Regions:
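Electropositive phosphate-/nucleotide-binding environments in soluble metabolic enzymes
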Residues: 63, 99, 141-144, 157, ...
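Short coil/turn segments at secondary-structure boundaries
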Residues: 162-166, 178, 209
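Active-site neighborhood of HAD-like aspartate-dependent phosphohydrolases
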Residues: 125-172
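C-terminal cap/substrate-recognition subdomain and adjoining C-terminal extension
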Residues: 2-42, 194-302
Length: 302
């Protein structure tokens, strides 16, 4: 059954008739290269808006998110064009071009609860100009939380994992949660750090991404609430330009249960991005921050 309908001689796709899964959109929207988004439907368009951008990204991304966004755009008098649906690392992604950048839309999206990632940008970063990528490490650049692995080897895995989960959800101040978790590691042999580092699984595509960015003249760094032992391992292996992470204090070959120096928290991550952008002469529109936890939000909002 063809979900397209005709209204006053114009073919259109009602948002309510879109397949729920983005994987099924290619067939339904194959008759046009891009689509004009209204509050009720998609209309085939020969040309797309590209003055500003909206990106939607997430495992749960579906037609309902686009319909909700359409209502928001209509309320603000914004026009938008939908580009073909895609995915990155197996996660659905939608890209829309708008007729102008709207600070009001930025604030409206921030004020609402969404179960996906989305943002409104004045410009998309490009590989044709110098840029800066700053990544979180644990569960972002790598597939584990290093402190949980250390704790497991030290015999306090369950206690530390519970605090980690609360911290990632923003239920605890990051600095306090880190001190509490590290304190549980007191007396553990420093050699367990080597065990974790030796079996540290990278996110799929990480080396390729870094290589492509470096070839394009981008700078790549890590700003992590994790530890220098592991961030340093990534820096050596991937040729990262900088790392910001916490240093575990050690005495006599044992962890003391404390962190040496200032803690890298949300504010420190944001400062790291700003510092590197200034040092490397990278404009704000060419900076990208990537993270998965509450302590990454300030960095991602720079």
């Amino acid at each position: 059954m063809n979900p397209m309908i005709s209204k006053e001689g114009v073919s259109l796709m009602l948002l309510s008739q879109l397949p729920r899964s983005l994987h099924d959109w290619s067939g339904a929207l194959s008759c046009a290269p891009c689509w004009q988004l209204t509050n009720e439907a998609l209309l085939p368009a020969a040309n797309a808006h590209d003055s500003a951008w909206i990106v939607l990204f997430g495992k749960g991304l579906e037609a309902g998110h686009l319909a909700r966004l359409a209502q928001q755009l209509d309320a603000l008098g914004l026009e938008a064009s939908l580009y073909p649906a895609g995915e990155q690392a197996g996660i659905p992604l939608l890209l829309l071009g708008t007729n102008r950048f709207s600070p009001e839309l930025v604030q409206a999206l921030k004020a609402q609860e969404w179960d996906i990632d989305l943002c409104h940008l004045a410009a998309l970063p490009t590989l044709s100009e110098p840029g800066l990528l700053v990544m979180d490490m644990d569960s972002t650049a790598i597939r584990i939380e290093c402190i949980d692995e250390i704790a497991r080897l030290a015999g306090v895995g369950e206690q530390v994992a519970a605090v980690t989960a609360a911290a990632m959800q923003g239920k605890l101040e990051f600095a306090d949660s880190l001190r509490a978790r590290v304190a549980l590691l007191e007396g553990a042999p420093v050699t367990i750090l080597d065990e974790v580092a030796a079996d540290m699984p990278w996110m799929p595509g990480l080396p390729l991404m870094v290589d492509i960015l470096k070839q394009a003249g981008w700078k790549v760094a890590i700003a992590s609430g994790g530890f220098t032992r592991f961030a340093g391992e990534l820096q050596r292996a991937l040729g990262l330009d900088a790392i910001f992470a916490n240093e575990l204090a050690v005495e006599g070959g044992l962890l003391t249960g404390k962190v040496s120096g200032p803690i890298v928290d949300a504010a420190a991550k944001a400062e790291a991005l700003q510092q590197l952008a200034s040092e490397y002469g990278v404009v704000a529109s060419q900076t990208v921050a990537v993270g998965d936890g509450a302590n990454d939000l300030k960095m991602m909002g720079v």
